[in-house]
């Protein structure tokens, strides 16, 4: 994929200039920057240790927007891929104040949950055990079809020793698509 993108850029016929600018700072193990679905000046930063920070007009809030530190597995070794791994805001986030998160809990289980940020109530939608400390995935996003897409890693270790990515009887090595439009639970 990188090669294809590089070839496309080379064939543009004009030089490409990239500029690095500071957006916000002072995060611990930031993994993801999630834009607000309807307000262009608001973003959310996901920290692996369990915090989600709100950034408005390039200014970090004084307090975390969401604190899941008591729920997530704290990464304890270099390369540890557990903790808070993903965040998705639905298109109607401004009205519902509901977010979706992907994290590995202290029991080494992947949790996909819906959180009402107005009252901080969490509903676990999907839960399954992780066999290793890495290859857990984490990316989540809403598609133009309104479904929530969830990237699930092969469960680890190096080389996928359990063959999870080829096994259709589990979630590993998959992109899940779920309908979260109901008030509780989800549909496939």
Predicted segments with their positions:
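Sec-dependent N-terminal signal peptides
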Residues: 2-15
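Short acidic, Gly/Pro-enriched loop/turn segments at secondary-structure junctions
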Residues: 181-188
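Acidic, Gly/Ser/Thr-rich repeat motifs that build Ca2+-stabilized beta-propeller blades
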Residues: 15-159
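Beta-propeller blade signature
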Residues: 111-119, 164-181
């Amino acid at each position: 994929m990188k090669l294809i993108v590089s070839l496309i850029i080379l064939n543009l016929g004009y030089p490409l200039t990239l500029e690095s600018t500071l957006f916000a700072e002072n995060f611990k193990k930031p993994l993801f920057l999630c834009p607000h679905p309807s307000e262009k000046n608001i973003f959310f930063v996901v920290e692996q240790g369990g915090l989600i920070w709100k950034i408005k007009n390039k200014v970090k809030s004084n307090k975390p927007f969401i604190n899941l530190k008591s729920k997530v597995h704290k990464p304890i070794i270099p390369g540890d891929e557990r903790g808070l791994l993903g965040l998705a805001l639905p298109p109607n986030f401004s009205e519902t104040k509901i977010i979706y998160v992907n994290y590995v809990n202290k029991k080494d289980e992947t949790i996909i949950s819906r959180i009402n940020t107005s009252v901080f109530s969490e509903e676990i939608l999907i839960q399954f055990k992780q066999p290793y400390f890495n290859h857990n995935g984490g990316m989540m996003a809403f598609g133009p079809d309104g479904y929530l897409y969830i990237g699930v890693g092969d469960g680890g270790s190096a080389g996928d020793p359990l063959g999870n990515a080829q096994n259709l009887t589990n979630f590993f090595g998959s992109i899940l698509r779920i309908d979260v439009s109901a008030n509780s639970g989800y549909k496939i």
